[in-house]
Amino acid sequence: MFTMTRAMEEALFQHFMHQKLGIAYAIHKPFPFFEGLLDNSIITKRMYMESLEACRNLIPVSRVVHNILTQLERTFNLSLLVTLFSQINLREYPNLVTIYRSFKRVGASYEWQSRDTPILLEAPTGLAEGSSLHTPLALPPPQPPQPSCSPCAPRVSEPGTSSQQSDEILSESPSPSDPVLPLPALIQEGRSTSVTNDKLTSKMNAEEDSEEMPSLLTSTVQVASDNLIPQIRDKEDPQEMPHSPLGSMPEIRDNSPEPNDPEEPQEVSSTPSDKKGKKRKRCIWSTPKRRHKKKSLPGGTASSRHGIQKKLKRVDQVPQKKDDSTCNSTVETRAQKARTECARKSRSEEIIDGTSEMNEGKRSQKTPSTPRRVTQGAASPGHGIQEKLQVVDKVTQRKDDSTWNSEVMMRVQKARTKCARKSRLKEKKKEKDICSSSKRRFQKNIHRRGKPKSDTVDFHCSKLPVTCGEAKGILYKKKMKHGSSVKCIRNEDGTWLTPNEFEVEGKGRNAKNWKRNIRCEGMTLGELLKRKNSDECEVCCQGGQLLCCGTCPRVFHEDCHIPPVEAKRMLWSCTFCRMKRSSGSQQCHHVSKTLERQMQPQDQLIRDYGEPFQEAMWLDLVKERLITEMYTVAWFVRDMRLMFRNHKTFYKASDFGQVGLDLEAEFEKDLKDVLGFHEANDGGFWTLP
């Protein structure tokens, strides 16, 4: 389990937003996903009932789930993920397992980052203040020591550590990577001073004898990885403090020059160092031998610097030699390239001249070749080319007639073989085209029979899963509207591709028509591009504010559809789609049984075939009774036939009466198909008493 933080919750929410479409397509059936959300009070009873009704109305389950997830974004919390990835859901929807693992990876990554956050500790900052003042220290996570860095200070667990523990920490041996530099012995807050006054040293020695050293704030000393830098620091140390009777004395140094006045050390101790802001703190336990050696340092420092400069010069000379060698190699390669280009040009010129000489043939034999005149004094590159041409002409003239005749015969034979091969290839291509066309027709028929259109895919969604051979991806409709040259398909690796590139990835060399090869659940992309929603109402054939059906391209006004459509509902299926679904499984019943039952929603919508006629019955009254669900089947059929009968009697002598008769015949035909009953009398229509 992970400890939930604000950052982790935000990361899980962003990951939920990205994986929302994948979750929707992973859930392929309503039960038990909807029931789990309802039992855990994540969705309301009303949302649950609307979702089930949408699934019954042939709305794809994936689109219903996507609609639920978008509404749950406002109240996102950890309980939603717990319910979503429960053991029951993971068992019923296997595709959720990969999405669940991705959420676990996000939580694990943020849990690891929370472990690596710095820990705030407090430690005393001053010598005289002891543990009264504390400053927080951010200690990084433990890392393996590197040769270029000095060992880090140990972790301070309590602010009031004893003086013995601080002495033990200070007396630890340094790491083998930095044997020259000792650990700092005495550190003040923010500054280091060089002490040269005898009074100040005596005061410090007295304080050391009288009082114990308080716990000190350990710090790290930045040391370069080069071996020369510690030597330079040892050699460039300033003069040593005067000898004290106590033997060892902690020395505090600064890069600033030594003061001349006796009052300056106090002023220097109160001002920070000016040179690069670096603190150089060392504790040197001086002995008479070391002091004697250090007094003779000023002369040795110059020699050490001189040696360092020599080493640096040697290091600089090595890359210079390498650069010279690389320059020489590049010059040689350029010269070789120039030579090869000249040789190629001369060979091509010889071949061209030879072919021209062979083509002329008889002319060269009959007329003696006259040498070309070359003007003297032409100092240009063309002069050398003309000389080469003369040499080539002489060589070609010496060729025998036999060789020329043999070459001509070889060329004729090659031309004949090429023509024969081309004719054979053309015949083979024609045969292949005929066979492939017949095979394609046969394969098309098989493909259409074997892969029917899927009812679970919402083709009106902005993202559609597409396939082409072995390649799989998601098509984004908004990007597809800008043209087929736009990268609108994202494959499984996350790369964006155009339809042609996606087809090449799936089909390889056989990619010829992306509209036919790219498919979405049994439908080609070309068929999906042709499907567009109508701009007119299916009932009244007028425009305005229309509502689109979720399963077909029909549109309706809110009042034209029976029953009326709620404008707030986004997922619904029209009555025509429900009629189509029920007509396939409709059984044929007798008239008496059919007329006795109550009208159902799919029975209430019959096409409006005529203009309203206000006599004894009119269409508005029929529509009102259908909306209020007052009709039985017999009552509805009687009102409709009464309206046709009145129309027939009113328009006897006009051609408009024949239109009413045709509409009546069409109505009776649709009535049989929708209600599913057969007539007992074969002659004429069945009439009510």
Swiss-Prot record:
Tissue specificity statement from the Swiss-Prot or TrEMBL entry: Highly expressed in peripheral blood leukocytes and spleen. Detected at intermediate levels in thymus, prostate, testis, ovary, small intestine and colon, and at low levels in heart, brain, placenta, lung, liver, skeletal muscle, kidney and pancreas.
Keywords annotated in UniProt: Bromodomain, DNA-binding, Host-virus interaction, Metal-binding, Nucleus, Phosphoprotein, Transcription, Transcription regulation, Zinc, Zinc-finger
Record-level Gene Ontology MF annotations: DNA binding; DNA-binding transcription factor activity, RNA polymerase II-specific; zinc ion binding
InterPro entries found in the cross-reference section: Bromodomain, Bromodomain-like_sf, HSR_dom, SAND-like_dom_sf, SAND_dom, Sp110/Sp140/Sp140L-like, Zinc_finger_PHD-type_CS, Znf_FYVE_PHD
Composition bias type Basic and acidic residues, residue spans: 314-325, 334-350
Post-translational modification Phosphoserine, affected residues: 175, 177, 244, 256, 380
Localization in the cell: Nucleus
Domain SAND: 454-535
UniProt modification remark: Phosphorylated (isoform 2).
Record note on quaternary structure: (Microbial infection) Isoform 3 interacts with HCV core protein.
Disease tied to this protein: Hepatic venoocclusive disease with immunodeficiency: Autosomal recessive primary immunodeficiency associated with hepatic vascular occlusion and fibrosis. The immunodeficiency is characterized by severe hypogammaglobulinemia, combined T and B-cell immunodeficiency, absent lymph node germinal centers, and absent tissue plasma cells.
Biological role: Transcription factor. May be a nuclear hormone receptor coactivator. Enhances transcription of genes with retinoic acid response elements (RARE).
Protein name in the entry: Sp110 nuclear body protein
Gene source species: Homo sapiens
